[in-house]
Every structure is written in C-alpha cells, then in structure tokens.
Amino acid sequence: IINGMGKGTFMPNKTMTRAEFAAIVTRALGLAAKDTKAFTDVPSSKWYAGYIGTANSSGIVNGVGSSKFNPDGTITRQEAAAMVARAAKLCGLDTAMDAAATKDMLAQFGDYRSVASWAKKPMAFCYSVNILDQSDLNIEPTKAILRCEIAQMLYNMLSAAELI
C-alpha cells in the first residue's frame, strides 16, 4: 500500500504530498487507478494521475479550487482526517457526527478551535473511532502530516472497518 522512498528506506518522519496520499488511499481501498482529467494541474503523464482521478471520482479527495489539485502540496493533519473519513465511509463506517458530539470530541484538545470548520466533523469522527490517537494534547490541524502518521491512520481505519 505504501511504497518506500528508495534504497530500502521508508522515511517515517517525512511529510507527504497530496499526490502521494491519493495513491496510498486508493491502493489501501483496492480501487483501480483511472485518470479522470478532473484537474488542470494533474497531467495524464504523471505517475499519480490515475490515483488522483480515482480518489476524486470516489469522493475521497477534492481539489483546492479553480480546477486545481496541487499534487505536490504537503498534506495537513486536517486534510488527511477529512480524506480518511471519506475513505472510511466508502468502507462502510458510519461517519456521521452531530454538532454536539463533534464539539465534545474536539473540546478535549487545547487547540480545537483552530480546526477549520470543514474539517471539524471528519476530525471528530477520526478521533471517535481511534483512527487518530486521543492521547495527544493538541490536534495541530495545519501541521504537515508525516508518512508514519498516515500509515497508522489507514491501518486504524481498515481495522475499524474490519477489513484487516
């Protein structure tokens, strides 16, 4: 599901691009890569075009506006949570969170107010089913997510969905 970075290394503390995430989540769900040409900044010739196309057409990833995906952009913790929550829904998990449950779940973290409004419910869902670790003191929603964190999130999601 997750390829190394060459020469037998995984580089767990390296950040991840949006393109890398689209590839990993598509492979994790066993979806076939198919370029949909949905974004003007994703050339068909790039290795990630099919993964981004499939992840987008499956409702897992969105663009960043103006028909762009920003494939080389670094993915943040709140973006990853939103995308993993969408993938979890495809796996059959109930990702619905009402406003009160969302606030209760996020309020335990010192920086919960810094989570973007669009990311609050998916972030709360990820914490509620232990896709994300509740023992952290802060969410750090705009911090770049690390390869090791994505690997753990996807493992936890697939486990919660009883797919592994």
Descriptions of predicted regions:
Residues 3-22, 26-51, 57-78, 86-119, ...:
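Feature responds to low-complexity, polar/acidic, surface-exposed segments characteristic
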Residues 148-151:
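Preference for long, well-ordered alpha-helical segments
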Residues 81:
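IQ-motif-like calmodulin-binding regions
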Residues 56-57, 127:
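Alpha-helix C-terminal capping/helix-coil junction sites
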